[in-house]
Design a protein with these regions (language model features):
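Membrane-spanning helices that line or support transport/gating and their immediate boundary helices
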Residues: 101, 133-140, 202, 213, ...
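Gly/Ser-rich, low-complexity
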Residues: 1-115, 128-139, 143, 147-148, ...
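Loop-centered beta-sheet repeat module
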Residues: 175-235
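Mid-bilayer segments of alpha-helical transmembrane spans in multi-pass integral membrane proteins
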Residues: 120-129, 148-165, 185-193, 197
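Hydrophobic alpha-helical transmembrane segments of multi-pass membrane proteins
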Residues: 82-89, 117-127, 182, 186-190, ...
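Alpha-helical transmembrane segments of polytopic integral membrane proteins
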Residues: 95-99, 127-134, 154, 158, ...
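Helical hairpin unit composed of two closely spaced alpha helices linked by a short loop
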Residues: 286-327
Length: 369
Protein backbone atom coordinates (compact mmCIF):
# COMPACT_ATOMS: atom_id res chain seq x y z
CA UNK A 1 0.00 0.00 0.00
CA UNK A 2 2.82 2.36 0.92
CA UNK A 3 4.62 1.61 -2.36
CA UNK A 4 1.44 2.34 -4.32
CA UNK A 5 0.98 5.69 -2.57
CA UNK A 6 4.63 6.53 -3.23
CA UNK A 7 4.26 5.74 -6.94
CA UNK A 8 1.16 7.91 -7.22
CA UNK A 9 2.95 10.73 -5.40
CA UNK A 10 5.99 10.52 -7.71
CA UNK A 11 3.79 10.43 -10.82
CA UNK A 12 1.84 13.50 -9.72
CA UNK A 13 5.06 15.33 -8.86
CA UNK A 14 6.51 14.67 -12.32
CA UNK A 15 3.21 15.78 -13.89
CA UNK A 16 3.23 19.07 -11.95
CA UNK A 17 6.87 19.73 -12.90
CA UNK A 18 6.04 19.16 -16.56
CA UNK A 19 3.13 21.60 -16.26
CA UNK A 20 5.42 24.29 -14.87
CA UNK A 21 7.85 24.14 -17.81
CA UNK A 22 5.78 25.96 -20.44
CA UNK A 23 4.88 28.89 -18.15
CA UNK A 24 7.29 31.21 -19.97
CA UNK A 25 5.96 30.08 -23.35
CA UNK A 26 2.40 30.58 -22.09
CA UNK A 27 3.41 34.06 -20.95
CA UNK A 28 4.55 34.98 -24.47
CA UNK A 29 1.39 33.43 -25.90
CA UNK A 30 -0.71 35.41 -23.43
CA UNK A 31 0.95 38.63 -24.60
CA UNK A 32 0.00 37.69 -28.16
CA UNK A 33 -3.57 36.68 -27.37
CA UNK A 34 -4.29 39.65 -25.11
CA UNK A 35 -4.36 42.10 -28.03
CA UNK A 36 -1.51 44.12 -26.55
CA UNK A 37 0.30 44.07 -29.90
CA UNK A 38 -2.29 46.53 -31.29
CA UNK A 39 -1.67 49.19 -28.62
CA UNK A 40 1.36 50.67 -30.37
CA UNK A 41 -0.56 51.03 -33.63
CA UNK A 42 -3.29 53.25 -32.17
CA UNK A 43 -0.81 55.79 -30.76
CA UNK A 44 0.02 59.01 -32.66
CA UNK A 45 3.30 59.05 -34.59
CA UNK A 46 5.10 61.31 -32.10
CA UNK A 47 4.24 59.01 -29.19
CA UNK A 48 5.30 55.95 -31.19
CA UNK A 49 8.63 57.58 -31.97
CA UNK A 50 9.23 58.43 -28.30
CA UNK A 51 8.41 54.91 -27.13
CA UNK A 52 10.58 53.32 -29.80
CA UNK A 53 13.48 55.54 -28.74
CA UNK A 54 13.20 54.34 -25.14
CA UNK A 55 12.74 50.70 -26.19
CA UNK A 56 9.17 50.33 -24.87
CA UNK A 57 7.17 47.50 -26.43
CA UNK A 58 3.65 46.36 -25.48
CA UNK A 59 4.76 42.74 -25.93
CA UNK A 60 7.52 43.01 -23.31
CA UNK A 61 7.89 44.33 -19.79
CA UNK A 62 9.52 47.81 -20.01
CA UNK A 63 13.03 48.23 -18.65
CA UNK A 64 13.39 49.77 -15.16
CA UNK A 65 14.95 52.93 -16.63
CA UNK A 66 12.32 53.37 -19.37
CA UNK A 67 10.70 56.35 -17.62
CA UNK A 68 14.08 58.09 -17.26
CA UNK A 69 14.80 57.52 -20.95
CA UNK A 70 11.36 58.91 -21.84
CA UNK A 71 11.95 62.15 -19.93
CA UNK A 72 15.43 62.41 -21.48
CA UNK A 73 13.93 62.07 -24.97
CA UNK A 74 11.33 64.73 -24.12
CA UNK A 75 14.02 67.15 -22.96
CA UNK A 76 16.00 66.59 -26.15
CA UNK A 77 12.89 67.32 -28.22
CA UNK A 78 12.28 70.55 -26.31
CA UNK A 79 15.87 71.69 -26.76
CA UNK A 80 15.41 71.29 -30.51
CA UNK A 81 12.31 73.54 -30.52
CA UNK A 82 13.18 76.28 -28.02
CA UNK A 83 14.15 78.87 -30.67
CA UNK A 84 10.56 79.86 -31.60
CA UNK A 85 9.51 80.62 -28.00
CA UNK A 86 12.76 82.51 -27.42
CA UNK A 87 12.20 84.68 -30.50
CA UNK A 88 8.63 85.39 -29.37
CA UNK A 89 9.84 86.45 -25.93
CA UNK A 90 12.40 88.84 -27.41
CA UNK A 91 9.74 90.29 -29.73
CA UNK A 92 7.30 90.84 -26.87
CA UNK A 93 9.90 92.44 -24.62
CA UNK A 94 11.01 94.71 -27.46
CA UNK A 95 7.37 95.71 -28.05
CA UNK A 96 6.96 96.56 -24.36
CA UNK A 97 10.08 98.73 -24.30
CA UNK A 98 9.22 100.45 -27.60
CA UNK A 99 5.65 101.22 -26.51
CA UNK A 100 6.91 102.70 -23.25
CA UNK A 101 9.44 104.87 -25.06
CA UNK A 102 6.77 106.14 -27.47
CA UNK A 103 4.48 106.92 -24.54
CA UNK A 104 7.19 109.00 -22.91
CA UNK A 105 7.67 111.21 -25.97
CA UNK A 106 4.10 111.25 -27.35
CA UNK A 107 1.15 113.26 -26.12
CA UNK A 108 -0.80 111.87 -23.17
CA UNK A 109 -3.89 111.44 -25.34
CA UNK A 110 -2.00 108.85 -27.40
CA UNK A 111 -0.86 106.80 -24.42
CA UNK A 112 -3.78 104.36 -24.51
CA UNK A 113 -3.60 104.04 -28.30
CA UNK A 114 0.09 103.17 -28.12
CA UNK A 115 -0.61 100.48 -25.52
CA UNK A 116 -3.38 99.04 -27.71
CA UNK A 117 -0.94 98.93 -30.63
CA UNK A 118 1.42 96.98 -28.39
CA UNK A 119 -1.39 94.54 -27.59
CA UNK A 120 -2.10 94.09 -31.31
CA UNK A 121 1.60 93.44 -31.93
CA UNK A 122 1.56 90.83 -29.16
CA UNK A 123 -1.55 89.28 -30.74
CA UNK A 124 0.26 88.95 -34.06
CA UNK A 125 3.14 87.26 -32.25
CA UNK A 126 1.13 84.91 -30.03
CA UNK A 127 -2.14 84.02 -31.73
CA UNK A 128 -0.56 81.76 -34.36
CA UNK A 129 1.32 79.54 -31.85
CA UNK A 130 -1.71 79.65 -29.53
CA UNK A 131 -3.98 78.41 -32.32
CA UNK A 132 -1.44 75.68 -33.09
CA UNK A 133 -1.40 74.62 -29.43
CA UNK A 134 -5.20 74.45 -29.37
CA UNK A 135 -5.21 72.24 -32.47
CA UNK A 136 -2.58 70.00 -30.91
CA UNK A 137 -4.65 69.82 -27.72
CA UNK A 138 -7.65 68.63 -29.74
CA UNK A 139 -5.50 65.95 -31.40
CA UNK A 140 -3.93 64.88 -28.10
CA UNK A 141 -7.26 64.49 -26.30
CA UNK A 142 -8.66 62.52 -29.24
CA UNK A 143 -5.52 60.33 -29.28
CA UNK A 144 -5.82 59.69 -25.54
CA UNK A 145 -9.47 58.69 -25.98
CA UNK A 146 -8.62 56.34 -28.87
CA UNK A 147 -5.80 54.76 -26.85
CA UNK A 148 -8.08 54.25 -23.86
CA UNK A 149 -10.77 52.65 -26.01
CA UNK A 150 -8.15 50.22 -27.36
CA UNK A 151 -6.30 49.61 -24.09
CA UNK A 152 -9.12 49.21 -21.55
CA UNK A 153 -10.46 45.92 -23.03
CA UNK A 154 -6.89 44.58 -22.98
CA UNK A 155 -6.43 45.70 -19.38
CA UNK A 156 -9.76 44.18 -18.30
CA UNK A 157 -9.02 40.89 -20.06
CA UNK A 158 -5.63 40.60 -18.37
CA UNK A 159 -7.20 41.39 -14.99
CA UNK A 160 -9.64 38.50 -15.53
CA UNK A 161 -6.78 36.20 -16.55
CA UNK A 162 -4.89 37.12 -13.39
CA UNK A 163 -7.91 36.10 -11.30
CA UNK A 164 -9.48 39.54 -10.76
CA UNK A 165 -12.89 38.52 -12.04
CA UNK A 166 -14.74 40.99 -9.79
CA UNK A 167 -12.48 43.98 -10.42
CA UNK A 168 -12.30 43.62 -14.21
CA UNK A 169 -15.98 44.29 -15.12
CA UNK A 170 -16.23 47.37 -12.88
CA UNK A 171 -12.88 48.67 -14.05
CA UNK A 172 -13.74 48.11 -17.70
CA UNK A 173 -17.12 49.82 -17.45
CA UNK A 174 -15.80 52.90 -15.62
CA UNK A 175 -12.72 53.29 -17.83
CA UNK A 176 -14.64 52.87 -21.09
CA UNK A 177 -17.21 55.40 -19.89
CA UNK A 178 -14.37 57.80 -19.07
CA UNK A 179 -12.78 57.25 -22.49
CA UNK A 180 -16.04 58.04 -24.28
CA UNK A 181 -16.62 61.06 -22.05
CA UNK A 182 -13.11 62.34 -22.79
CA UNK A 183 -13.67 62.03 -26.52
CA UNK A 184 -17.02 63.86 -26.44
CA UNK A 185 -16.12 66.58 -23.94
CA UNK A 186 -12.78 67.43 -25.52
CA UNK A 187 -14.16 67.89 -29.03
CA UNK A 188 -17.53 69.42 -28.08
CA UNK A 189 -16.74 71.44 -24.95
CA UNK A 190 -13.14 71.92 -23.84
CA UNK A 191 -11.40 73.07 -27.02
CA UNK A 192 -14.26 75.34 -28.24
CA UNK A 193 -14.49 76.94 -24.77
CA UNK A 194 -10.74 77.57 -24.76
CA UNK A 195 -11.03 79.28 -28.15
CA UNK A 196 -13.87 81.47 -26.86
CA UNK A 197 -11.85 82.28 -23.75
CA UNK A 198 -8.88 83.37 -25.86
CA UNK A 199 -11.14 85.49 -28.10
CA UNK A 200 -12.64 87.21 -25.04
CA UNK A 201 -9.13 87.93 -23.73
CA UNK A 202 -8.13 89.58 -27.02
CA UNK A 203 -11.37 91.59 -27.21
CA UNK A 204 -11.03 92.76 -23.62
CA UNK A 205 -7.49 94.00 -24.27
CA UNK A 206 -8.01 95.94 -27.52
CA UNK A 207 -11.57 97.29 -27.11
CA UNK A 208 -13.42 99.37 -24.53
CA UNK A 209 -15.45 96.35 -23.37
CA UNK A 210 -14.43 95.14 -19.92
CA UNK A 211 -14.71 91.36 -20.13
CA UNK A 212 -12.35 90.58 -17.26
CA UNK A 213 -15.11 89.41 -14.90
CA UNK A 214 -16.55 87.20 -17.61
CA UNK A 215 -13.19 85.63 -18.43
CA UNK A 216 -12.39 85.16 -14.73
CA UNK A 217 -15.73 83.43 -14.15
CA UNK A 218 -15.23 81.21 -17.20
CA UNK A 219 -11.72 80.34 -16.01
CA UNK A 220 -12.97 79.29 -12.57
CA UNK A 221 -15.85 77.24 -13.97
CA UNK A 222 -13.59 75.29 -16.34
CA UNK A 223 -10.90 74.78 -13.69
CA UNK A 224 -13.26 73.45 -11.03
CA UNK A 225 -15.14 71.31 -13.54
CA UNK A 226 -11.88 69.62 -14.55
CA UNK A 227 -10.82 69.12 -10.92
CA UNK A 228 -14.22 67.69 -10.00
CA UNK A 229 -14.34 65.32 -12.98
CA UNK A 230 -10.86 63.89 -12.41
CA UNK A 231 -11.39 63.62 -8.63
CA UNK A 232 -14.71 61.80 -9.01
CA UNK A 233 -13.33 59.38 -11.61
CA UNK A 234 -10.18 58.64 -9.62
CA UNK A 235 -12.04 58.29 -6.33
CA UNK A 236 -14.80 56.02 -7.63
CA UNK A 237 -12.38 53.81 -9.58
CA UNK A 238 -9.97 53.55 -6.62
CA UNK A 239 -12.68 52.68 -4.07
CA UNK A 240 -14.37 50.15 -6.36
CA UNK A 241 -11.02 48.53 -7.18
CA UNK A 242 -9.89 48.34 -3.54
CA UNK A 243 -13.18 46.81 -2.36
CA UNK A 244 -13.39 44.32 -5.24
CA UNK A 245 -9.74 43.34 -4.93
CA UNK A 246 -10.09 42.73 -1.18
CA UNK A 247 -13.00 40.37 -1.84
CA UNK A 248 -11.01 38.60 -4.56
CA UNK A 249 -7.98 38.17 -2.30
CA UNK A 250 -10.13 36.65 0.44
CA UNK A 251 -11.84 34.33 -2.05
CA UNK A 252 -8.52 33.35 -3.61
CA UNK A 253 -6.99 32.42 -0.26
CA UNK A 254 -10.08 30.40 0.65
CA UNK A 255 -9.89 28.54 -2.68
CA UNK A 256 -6.20 27.73 -2.17
CA UNK A 257 -6.88 26.41 1.34
CA UNK A 258 -9.79 24.34 0.03
CA UNK A 259 -7.65 22.75 -2.70
CA UNK A 260 -4.78 22.11 -0.29
CA UNK A 261 -7.05 20.40 2.23
CA UNK A 262 -9.42 18.60 -0.13
CA UNK A 263 -6.80 16.74 -2.20
CA UNK A 264 -4.70 14.43 -0.02
CA UNK A 265 -0.90 14.55 -0.14
CA UNK A 266 -0.51 16.67 -3.31
CA UNK A 267 -3.20 19.31 -2.72
CA UNK A 268 -0.66 21.94 -1.70
CA UNK A 269 1.47 21.13 -4.76
CA UNK A 270 -1.54 21.66 -7.04
CA UNK A 271 -2.28 24.94 -5.27
CA UNK A 272 1.31 26.14 -5.72
CA UNK A 273 1.35 25.15 -9.40
CA UNK A 274 -1.87 27.08 -9.98
CA UNK A 275 -0.34 30.10 -8.22
CA UNK A 276 2.68 29.91 -10.53
CA UNK A 277 0.45 29.94 -13.62
CA UNK A 278 -1.59 32.87 -12.32
CA UNK A 279 1.63 34.70 -11.43
CA UNK A 280 2.70 34.40 -15.08
CA UNK A 281 -0.56 36.07 -16.09
CA UNK A 282 0.06 38.77 -13.48
CA UNK A 283 3.50 39.45 -14.99
CA UNK A 284 1.90 39.97 -18.39
CA UNK A 285 -0.73 42.22 -16.81
CA UNK A 286 1.94 44.34 -15.12
CA UNK A 287 4.02 44.56 -18.30
CA UNK A 288 1.08 45.80 -20.37
CA UNK A 289 0.07 48.17 -17.57
CA UNK A 290 3.57 49.64 -17.44
CA UNK A 291 3.54 50.14 -21.21
CA UNK A 292 0.14 51.83 -20.94
CA UNK A 293 1.56 54.18 -18.32
CA UNK A 294 4.51 55.12 -20.55
CA UNK A 295 2.25 55.47 -23.59
CA UNK A 296 -0.08 57.82 -21.71
CA UNK A 297 2.86 60.01 -20.71
CA UNK A 298 4.19 59.99 -24.28
CA UNK A 299 0.81 61.18 -25.59
CA UNK A 300 0.30 64.29 -23.49
CA UNK A 301 3.67 65.31 -21.99
CA UNK A 302 5.15 66.81 -25.21
CA UNK A 303 2.21 69.20 -25.56
CA UNK A 304 2.29 70.07 -21.85
CA UNK A 305 5.98 70.97 -22.11
CA UNK A 306 5.37 73.19 -25.15
CA UNK A 307 2.40 74.89 -23.51
CA UNK A 308 4.40 75.42 -20.30
CA UNK A 309 7.17 77.11 -22.30
CA UNK A 310 4.69 79.51 -23.94
CA UNK A 311 3.04 80.09 -20.56
CA UNK A 312 6.39 81.15 -19.12
CA UNK A 313 6.85 83.55 -22.05
CA UNK A 314 3.41 85.11 -21.53
CA UNK A 315 4.06 85.44 -17.81
CA UNK A 316 7.44 87.14 -18.28
CA UNK A 317 6.16 89.48 -21.01
CA UNK A 318 3.01 90.27 -18.98
CA UNK A 319 5.12 91.11 -15.96
CA UNK A 320 7.25 93.44 -18.08
CA UNK A 321 4.12 95.13 -19.49
CA UNK A 322 2.71 95.68 -16.00
CA UNK A 323 5.99 97.15 -14.74
CA UNK A 324 6.08 99.53 -17.72
CA UNK A 325 2.45 100.57 -17.19
CA UNK A 326 1.03 99.11 -20.43
CA UNK A 327 -2.36 97.96 -19.13
CA UNK A 328 -4.01 96.75 -22.39
CA UNK A 329 -0.89 94.82 -23.35
CA UNK A 330 -0.59 93.34 -19.85
CA UNK A 331 -4.29 92.40 -19.93
CA UNK A 332 -3.87 90.57 -23.24
CA UNK A 333 -0.75 88.72 -22.11
CA UNK A 334 -2.38 87.71 -18.82
CA UNK A 335 -5.40 86.46 -20.79
CA UNK A 336 -3.14 84.34 -22.99
CA UNK A 337 -1.42 82.99 -19.88
CA UNK A 338 -4.80 82.06 -18.36
CA UNK A 339 -5.82 80.32 -21.60
CA UNK A 340 -2.58 78.34 -21.57
CA UNK A 341 -3.10 77.36 -17.93
CA UNK A 342 -6.54 76.05 -18.83
CA UNK A 343 -5.12 74.19 -21.83
CA UNK A 344 -2.48 72.53 -19.65
CA UNK A 345 -5.12 71.67 -17.04
CA UNK A 346 -7.42 70.16 -19.67
CA UNK A 347 -4.66 68.07 -21.26
CA UNK A 348 -3.32 66.96 -17.87
CA UNK A 349 -6.84 65.97 -16.78
CA UNK A 350 -7.22 63.77 -19.85
CA UNK A 351 -3.72 62.41 -19.26
CA UNK A 352 -4.58 61.72 -15.61
CA UNK A 353 -7.51 59.54 -16.68
CA UNK A 354 -5.22 57.51 -18.96
CA UNK A 355 -2.46 57.28 -16.32
CA UNK A 356 -4.84 56.22 -13.54
CA UNK A 357 -6.41 53.60 -15.81
CA UNK A 358 -2.97 52.06 -16.41
CA UNK A 359 -1.80 52.50 -12.81
CA UNK A 360 -4.79 50.56 -11.47
CA UNK A 361 -3.75 47.59 -13.60
CA UNK A 362 -0.28 47.76 -12.04
CA UNK A 363 -1.52 48.15 -8.47
CA UNK A 364 -4.20 45.44 -8.41
CA UNK A 365 -2.87 42.19 -6.96
CA UNK A 366 -3.84 38.82 -8.35
CA UNK A 367 -6.61 37.03 -6.49
CA UNK A 368 -4.47 33.90 -6.03
CA UNK A 369 -1.14 35.64 -5.29
Amino acid sequence: MKKRILRVFLALTVFILLLSLPVRADEAELYQNSGADTLMEVLPEEAQSLLQNVGADPMETPAPDAAIKLFSALSEGFRAEWTAPARALLTLLASCVLCRLVQEFAAKELSYAVSVCGALCAAVTLLSPMASLLEQAARVTDAAAVFLLAAVPVYAGLLCTAGNTVTAPTYGALSLAAANAVSVLSSAVLIPVLRVFLAFSVASAVTSFDLKRLTDALYKVIKWALVLAVTVYTGVLSVQTIVANSAEMAGGKAAKMLVSGAIPIVGSAFSDAFSVIVSGAALVKNGVGAFGLLASLAIFLPLCIKAAAWLLICFCAGLAAEVLGLKPLASFLNGCAAALRLLIAAVCSVGAVAVVSAAVVLCVRGAYA
